[in-house]
């Protein structure tokens, strides 16, 4: 395989990233190729910037009863995302493509989604793709198996990818755990910090921004715009509390396996924030734990993880 045939599509809450890759079977690693392009849902004329997802309890109930009832707004928003993905595929039509997406999936599409519309028939609309990969899995796969990854030599570690939500990852004895099938390993959105806050709502960049906006009647869009706000120090203190809760839960699991966490890698938007602007906050995080923290600030890793997941499937 080479750059002409391998690519990954990383679907997020606001955009799609396409990244081609050069795969080496000799070292079982993928390197970034020449194609890198982002497609924003908001560029579509029908994008609803005020879209509100169906409550998670309702989504889960409908999924479990095999009776998913999409609202008109969900269908419209889903169609925007489908159109965007289809457009992105056009620049890599001659490639073998892997695609990752957040949310709970069936073999046909997205059936539970915390930060967007459900699209239960997604594969029907993206014919070249036979299955949809988990975004969390692709994040950590990219960190391990891409030449730009920060976990290439990690035997026992945890990954915390922060964006619209939290991408959770665990490497145990050199293997990526399937968190959906592992007992005793709740994901960030399942770990309560208080009665109405989870690790995900307090630690993800989107959650941090939402809390600030709700508390201050503001409309801040990006984390970097909060750095010099007086309220931000407390919000980051709450983020640190959530981080420590997550680490404690993960340490408990590793102890049950007679292993110790070797390192923590913080990636995606949260990693980029720490890398670009948040040095003093990173120091607070590092001083709170004896486990070394590394930062992954390259946003291409998830797409490369999707690409190599396809190559090795």
Language model: regions and residue ranges:
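Short glycine-rich anion-binding loops that position phosphate/pyrophosphate groups of nucleotides
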Residues: 14, 102-105, 163-165, 270-271
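Adenine-nucleotide phosphate-binding core of ATP-dependent small-molecule kinases
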Residues: 62-95, 201, 209-274, 292-302
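Conserved glycine-rich phosphate/nucleotide-binding loop
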Residues: 2, 286-313
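Short active-site-adjacent structural elements
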Residues: 167-169, 272-278, 303
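Glycine-rich phosphate-binding loop and adjoining helix at the ATP-binding site
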Residues: 45-156, 273-293
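Glycine/GP-enriched mid-protein hinge/lid loop-to-helix segment characteristic of carbohydrate kinases
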Residues: 5, 16-59, 131-133, 146-234
């Amino acid at each position: 395989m080479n750059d002409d045939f391998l690519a990954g599509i990383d679907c997020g809450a606001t955009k799609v990233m396409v990244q081609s890759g050069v795969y080496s079977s000799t070292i079982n690693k993928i390197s970034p190729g020449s194609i890198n392009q982002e497609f924003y849902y908001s560029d579509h004329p029908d994008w609803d910037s005020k879209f509100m997802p169906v409550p998670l309890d309702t989504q889960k109930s409908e999924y479990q009863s095999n009776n998913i009832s999409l609202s008109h707004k969900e269908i419209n928003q889903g169609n925007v995302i489908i159109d965007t993905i289809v457009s992105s595929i056009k620049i890599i039509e001659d490639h073998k493509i892997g695609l990752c997406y957040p949310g709970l999936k069936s073999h046909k599409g997205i059936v539970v989604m915390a930060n967007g519309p459900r699209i239960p028939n997604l594969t029907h609309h993206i014919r070249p793709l036979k299955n949809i990969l988990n975004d969390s899995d692709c994040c950590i796969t990219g960190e391990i198996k891409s030449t730009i990854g920060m976990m290439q030599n990690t035997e026992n570690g945890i990954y915390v990818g922060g964006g619209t939500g939290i991408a959770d990852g665990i490497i145990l004895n050199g293997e990526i755990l399937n968190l959906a099938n592992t007992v005793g390993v709740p994901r960030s959105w399942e770990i309560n910090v208080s009665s109405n806050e989870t690790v995900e709502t307090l630690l993800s960049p989107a959650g941090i921004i939402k809390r600030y906006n709700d508390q201050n009647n503001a409309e801040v869009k990006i984390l970097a715009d909060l750095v010099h706000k007086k309220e931000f120090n407390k919000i980051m203190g709450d983020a640190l509390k959530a981080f420590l809760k997550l680490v404690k839960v993960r340490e408990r699991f590793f102890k049950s396996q007679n292993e110790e966490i070797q390192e923590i890698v913080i990636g995606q938007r949260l990693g980029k924030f720490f890398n670009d602007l948040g040095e003093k906050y990173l120091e607070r995080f590092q001083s709170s734990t004896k486990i070394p923290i590394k930062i992954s600030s390259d946003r291409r890793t998830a797409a490369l993880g999707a690409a190599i997941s396809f190559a090795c499937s």
